[in-house]
Amino acid sequence: MPKMKTHKGAAGRFEVMKRGKLRRRRAGHNHILEKKTSKRKRRLNTETYVNPADEKRVRRLLGVR
């Protein structure tokens, strides 16, 4: 059976932490920022974790257990 390939798009977006959690950035903080409030931009700037319902799919893309 051939090796599993890492999905490079997912590899750039997610990071596996030491405890096994998957970290991601929040969407909506790249452009069109002028109309967004400072409070909203601060909130969007923080990192968060992948929802447990999506973890299995993301792990498969990354090729990690």
Curated annotation (Swiss-Prot):
Gene Ontology annotations for the cellular component aspect, listed alphabetically: cytosolic large ribosomal subunit
GO molecular function, one term: structural constituent of ribosome
Keyword Ribosomal protein: yes
The keyword S-adenosyl-L-methionine is assigned to this record: no
Keywords: Ribonucleoprotein, Ribosomal protein
GO biological processes: translation
Coiled coil regions in record: none
Record NCBIfam families: rpmI_bact (TIGR00001)
UniProt similarity note: Belongs to the bacterial ribosomal protein bL35 family.
Name recorded for this polypeptide: Large ribosomal subunit protein bL35
Gene source species: Rubrobacter xylanophilus (strain DSM 9941 / JCM 11954 / NBRC 16129 / PRD-1)
